[in-house]
UniProtKB/Swiss-Prot annotation:
Its main location: membrane. Keywords: Membrane, Transmembrane, Transmembrane helix. Disulfide bonds: none annotated. This is Uncharacterized protein MG397. The keyword Transmembrane helix applies. It is found in: Membrane. It is a single-pass membrane protein. The keyword Transmembrane helix applies. One of its GO terms (biological process) is septin ring assembly.
């Protein structure tokens, strides 16, 4: 009994250890079983038919890829058999009692897992082999979607702008043909018939592009047609305005001529209307070359008639108001021209422009008198001559305006040249005057060469100023040539004078500093006396050089005596 009690804990420990070992093996077997079931489910859910079908449909002939498809089908049969066998084995291994057959279960479940892994690897290899077929299938549909989008835009454009106005049967036939081509291409994609698919795609591309070009050109001509129609309405309205305004614009005694003009315009408008009707027919027949030529002719005809009608309905009262404004400003214009002529009486180009202006003024005055004579004639008015005089007067006024603008611009430019001449001349004279005052005020001893340059430049400037009163143009040209030389001379004189002033100023500053040490040494005092004499003789370069040498010696002696230089 005592021995049993002693061995009891040991027995319990052994039993507990065996229980833990059994639980560990059971847990490991459950994990292997779960992993194998997951792999089985993934393989079971994968459909190998979707891999074989595109590859099988891609062939153009039934026997072309027969051997390859045979291999794929053999693998599919093997794949299905393996999956079914795995299901049967998993059913056996999933029984509760079998999981406790540790060695047998572990060996068989690992073998099944290995077989399924090998099956999965083989399946991925075949999927990679047939991947290009699937990619081709998807890209074909992407291309088809692109053309469908273009077709939708074209269909919408035709329905909105063209199909109701023009040959709807033509566009309906084209749209139906394109729809049938889409169906054919879809069938080729499904059947993987590459050659037919490419042929249908090329045909679709050509028809679609030609239809887009045709619709676009037809729409543009439709816009031009609307534009021309609008111009015709404006022309017809202007004809009606002519009839309403005949009592004001055209004398009643010339009514027969007015009606003749209106009838001629009306006939031409009717011809243009008939031409527009033919243009609609040409647009419907899509003869773009003839349409372009017809529209070009029509536009020229409309422009020509518009000018004619504008001439007929010209507002004579407004024209008279313009003439009155001109007559009011004519005296001021003449005064201005005389003032410019007086200022520039020796200028040939100004004189020629003034002659041209006077000729235009005389022509305008003559035309105004003729216009007044035509307007006062109550019995008979020659409107052809009246319109001709109005046109001539307008041209003369425009020419007068341009000539006057040219004259004013020329005068302004010459005034600018004159101001430049006077300002530059006075500026040179004033600067030389300032330099002379500076020399006098500072009592500078300037070199004879510098004084000679100053006197020569002043004399030359005075001569130019005097000569300008007699021959301004020649003097201006001469002065323009000498500006650079005068500027160089002025710069040299300024440099000479300023350098003297600066030297004297530096000498003064050096004397102020050196005088502080005059009592330190008799040598310093004697040196300063000599330098002062040089300074009084205005020998500033030698004075400054001597002062610099003296200050250098003072600085050296101060350092040797250990004195602090102030």
């Amino acid at each position: 009994m005592l021995v049993f009690l002693i061995l009891l804990p040991f027995l319990l420990l052994v039993i507990f250890g065996a229980y833990l070992l059994v639980c560990l093996f059971v847990r490991q077997n459950n994990l292997l079983l779960k992993k194998t079931k997951q792999l089985y489910n993934n393989l079971k859910l994968s459909n190998f038919n979707c891999v074989i079908s595109p590859f099988q449909l891609l062939r153009n002939e039934k026997q072309a890829l027969e051997q390859s498809i045979k291999v794929l089908k053999q693998f599919q049969i093997k794949f299905d058999n393996e999956i079914n066998s795995a299901f049967e084995q998993l059913t056996v291994y999933s029984k509760p009692n079998n999981i406790y057959r540790f060695i047998w279960f572990n060996r068989n479940i690992k073998l099944l897992n290995k077989n399924l892994q090998h099956l999965y690897t083989k399946q991925q290899e075949y999927i990679n082999l047939t991947k290009n077929a699937i990619v081709y299938f998807n890209n074909s549909y992407d291309c088809l979607v692109f053309y469908r989008q273009a077709f939708c835009f074209l269909n919408q454009f035709i329905n909105n702008f063209l199909i109701e106005k023009y040959d709807s049967l033509f566009y309906l036939n084209v749209l139906n043909r394109i729809s049938l081509l889409f169906k054919e291409i879809e069938n080729c994609i499904q059947a993987k018939d590459v050659e037919k698919q490419i042929a249908f795609l090329n045909k679709l591309h050509n028809i679609l592009s030609q239809t887009i070009i045709t619709a676009n050109r037809q729409y543009m001509f439709d816009i031009k047609l609307s534009y021309l129609t609008h111009h015709f309405k404006v022309l017809i309205q202007k004809v009606k305005q002519m009839e309403l305004m005949k009592n004001k614009v055209i004398n009643s005694q010339d009514l027969l001529k007015l009606h003749e003009l209106i009838n001629n315009i009306t006939i031409k408008l009717k011809d243009c209307t008939n031409f527009l009707n033919n243009l609609n027919l040409m647009l419907c027949e899509r003869n773009m070359d003839e349409v372009q030529e017809a529209i070009s002719w029509l536009f020229q005809a409309v422009s020509s008639k518009e000018k004619s009608i504008n001439l007929v309905v010209e507002n004579i009262d407004d024209f008279r108001n313009q003439i009155q404004q001109y007559e009011k400003k004519n005296e001021l214009l003449k005064t201005t021209i005389k003032a410019i002529e007086l200022v520039f009486q020796n200028e040939t180009d100004v004189h020629d422009l003034i002659i041209e202006l006077n000729e235009n003024c005389d022509l305008i005055t003559k035309n105004i008198n003729n216009l007044n004579h035509q307007s006062l004639a109550q019995n008979q008015i020659n409107y052809e001559k009246l319109f001709y005089l109005m046109s001539q007067t307008n041209q003369a006024l425009e020419k007068l305006k341009n000539s006057l603008t040219d004259l004013l611009n020329l005068a302004v430019n010459k005034f600018d040249d004159y101001r430049f001449f006077v300002y530059t001349l006075d500026d040179f004279r004033f600067k030389f005057f300032q330099i002379e005052n500076l020399i006098s005020d500072q009592d500078l001893k300037v070199p004879a060469k510098t004084l000679q340059v100053i006197n020569k430049s002043k004399l030359e400037l005075d001569n130019i100023f005097t000569e300008a009163n007699n021959n301004y143009l020649g003097t201006f040209n001469l002065f323009s040539e000498k500006i650079d030389l005068l500027q160089i001379q002025l710069t040299e004189v300024i440099c000479d004078v300023v350098s003297l002033v600066n030297l004297r100023l530096m000498c003064k500053q050096a004397f102020l500093f050196a005088n502080k040490y005059r009592q330190k040494s008799s040598h310093i005092d004697r040196s300063l006396e000599q330098l002062t004499k040089l300074y009084n003789r205005q020998n500033y370069p030698d004075t400054l050089e001597g002062l610099i040498n003296l200050l250098t010696k003072i600085k050296t002696n101060t350092k040797q005596d250990y004195l602090e230089l102030n």
